[in-house]
Every structure is written in structure tokens, then in C-alpha cells.
């Protein structure tokens, strides 16, 4: 079968939004080529943890590649993707050039091509994320492994926002905590929470593909006795109280439910948010404070922030 590779040149800020647009348009796979991956802060902290070829990355910006079967409606699909991307600046998301190019590829070329971007990565003092197809031996008895098979629909769990969320969980999760993961995606944050000692984790996502991916990864990590995965829109209809809520979502989505988070998390409980570009830190912090939260700590990595807030 012939497939079309749609390449979009954009910014790091727009990666999550553009990836979501491509998934919604029916992409059968998405790969992200971000030159920031070549010089991650974690390389300096943890040594040479992966080897990437600089020639495969753009000189500037981020290249997002998505794969669609060649059909009569492909041109309409691409036009729809372009229209959705062109709207992002109205949400204060900088898209860069937004240039779109199309190339024809064979199925065998793209079906495994995305795996070359995914290697074992130590993202904190505690956790290393390992793809299921690679052998990896922990360097110490205290090192915790999260095995992920993200398929071609979700990221590798090594984006700065995910890394910061996991580091925030390391700081805050207590044995026996009840936790909710809003917008779970691959399920990586729920798995981390379970491995940190949470007694129950509710993982929710609106996307049925995400629910399926998270369920698979939860089973893969043998945390299905702690983590339950379900389809839901944010915190609609969810009752508390829980000790902690974590949400790694776009800032615009986080702004939709601070009040619900304050309702569901117990008094004195925590709300960890990320997916927040640095320019949006103030508006998110203000929304959290208006809902009754107190900002306890802000984590920063590259152009992203994660916020740890405590409920009144």
C-alpha cells in the first residue's frame, strides 16, 4: 500500500496542538523531529543516554511527520489540517512557518521508521522510560522502569512536560494516595504514580485510541491492579475526593477545569499541571489561584513549565 508522509514545519510550542490535529484527522502515525532532543538538559545530568543523528533533524523549529493512506479524499484531509493549524495563532500558539510538504512512502518504510527516535531515556533520578522492543538493565536497584509501546499515535513519554510531571509526582506522591490522571494519553503518568506507591489511579482520556493505548501500557507494566483507565471528558461527572490530580494538557484545556479540580481534589490535596508554555504560566497560575489553589512550586524545562498547586 502507498502512503503519504505529511511534513509540517512548526515550533516546539505548537507540537502538542499540531500532533492532536493530525491524530484527529486520522493519521496512522506521527513522528516528531525536534532538534532540542539533541541537546536535552537531561544529557548533562545523566550522561549519554541515547544517540541521535543530527542530520535527521531540522536546523530550526520542529518537523512533525504524519502518515495517511493515499485516498481520493487526501487533498481534503490536508486542507482541513492546514485550516486547523492556521487557527492556532488565535489561541496565542505560535506556529512558525507552518509549511506543509507531502511525500509518497511505502508502508514498510513508515511502519517502523518512528522507532528510530525512541530509545531508553532516564528522565529523573528514579525513572527510565524504555521502549518494549529494546533490552535494558537498570543501573541500580532503586531505578524504576516504565516500559512503553506508544504505537504510532502517541509520544515517547520524554517530552519536557511529561518529564516535569513525573518529577513533580516523585516530589509529591505518598504511599496510599488516590490519584486522577486527566488526559492520560499513553498512560505514562498513571504508571509512574502507581510505581511511586499510589493505591489507586483513575486515568481518563476523551480519545478512545488513547484509552486503548493506556490500557495496553498499564498491563505491560503490571500496574493494572492499581490503575483503571476510562473514557471521559476532563473531570465531568467525576467525584472525589482524591489526594492528587495530574494533567499534562495544553494550557487552553487546563483553563477549562480548575474549578472542577478544586471540587474533586481534597482540601490540602495537590493539582499538578503541565503542557504549559512559559508565556502562559501567569494566566494558568491566576486561574488556579482564583479556583482556590495556592501555587507551591513551578518546575521549568526549556520553554515549558509545570505547576504544583495545593487546594485550600
Curated annotation (Swiss-Prot):
One of its GO terms (cellular component) is cytoplasm. Keywords: Cytoplasm, Methyltransferase, S-adenosyl-L-methionine, Transferase. SUPFAM superfamilies: S-adenosyl-L-methionine-dependent methyltransferases. The keyword Cytoplasm applies. One of its GO terms (molecular function) is protein-lysine N-methyltransferase activity. CDD domains: AdoMet_MTases. S-adenosyl-L-methionine binds at residues 162, 183, 205, 248. GO terms for biological process: methylation. It is found in: Cytoplasm. It is an enzyme of class 2 (transferase). InterPro entries: Ribosomal_L11_MeTrfase_PrmA (IPR050078), Ribosomal_PrmA_MeTrfase (IPR004498), SAM-dependent_MTases_sf (IPR029063). The keyword DNA-binding does not apply. Belongs to the methyltransferase superfamily. PrmA family. Methylates ribosomal protein L11. This is Ribosomal protein L11 methyltransferase. It comes from Bacillus cereus (strain G9842). The lineage of its organism: Bacteria, Bacillati, Bacillota, Bacilli, Bacillales.
Amino acid at each position: 500500500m502507498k502512503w503519504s508522509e505529511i511534513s509540517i514545519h512548526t515550533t516546539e510550542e505548537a507540537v502538542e496542538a499540531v500532533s492532536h490535529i493530525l491524530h484527529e484527522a486520522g493519521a496512522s502515525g506521527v513522528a516528531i523531529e525536534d532538534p532540542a532532543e539533541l541537546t536535552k538538559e537531561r544529557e548533562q545530568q545523566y550522561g549519554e543516554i541515547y544517540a541521535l543523528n543530527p542530520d535527521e533533524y531540522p536546523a530550526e523549529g520542529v518537523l512533525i511527520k504524519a502518515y495517511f493512506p493515499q485516498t481520493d479524499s487526501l487533498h481534503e484531509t490536508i486542507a482541513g489540517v492546514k485550516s486547523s493549524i492556521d487557527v492556532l495563532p488565535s489561541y496565542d500558539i505560535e506556529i512558525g512557518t507552518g509549511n506543509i510538504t507531502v511525500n509518497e512512502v511505502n508502508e514498510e518504510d513508515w511502519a517502523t521508521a518512528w522507532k528510530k527516535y525512541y530509545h531508553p531515556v532516564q528522565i529523573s533520578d528514579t525513572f527510565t522510560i524504555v521502549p518494549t522492543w529494546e533490552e535494558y538493565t537498570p543501573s541500580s536497584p532503586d531505578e524504576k522502569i516504565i516500559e512503553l509501546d506508544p504505537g504510532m499515535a502517541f509520544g515517547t513519554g520524554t517530552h519536557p512536560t511529561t518529564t516535569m510531571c513525573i518529577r513533580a509526582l516523585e516530589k509529591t506522591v505518598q504511599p496510599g494516595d488516590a490519584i486522577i490522571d486527566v488526559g492520560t494519553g499513553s498512560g505514562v503518568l498513571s504508571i509512574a504514580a502507581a510505581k511511586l506507591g499510589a493505591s489507586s489511579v483513575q486515568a481518563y482520556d476523551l480519545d478512545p485510541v488513547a484509552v486503548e493505548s493506556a490500557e495496553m501500557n498499564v498491563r505491560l507494566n503490571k500496574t493494572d491492579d492499581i490503575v483503571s483507565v476510562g473514557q471521559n471528558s476532563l473531570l465531568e461527572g467525576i467525584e472525589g475526593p482524591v489526594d492528587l490530580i495530574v494533567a499534562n494538557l495544553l494550557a487552553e484545556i487546563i483553563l477549562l477545569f480548575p474549578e472542577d479540580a478544586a471540587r474533586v481534589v481534597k482540601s490540602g490535596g495537590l493539582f499538578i499541571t503541565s503542557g504549559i508554555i512559559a508565556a502562559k504560566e501567569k494566566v494558568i497560575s491566576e486561574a488556579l489561584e482564583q479556583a482556590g489553589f495556592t501555587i507551591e512550586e513551578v518546575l521549568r524545562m526549556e520553554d515549558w513549565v509545570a505547576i504544583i498547586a495545593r487546594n485550600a
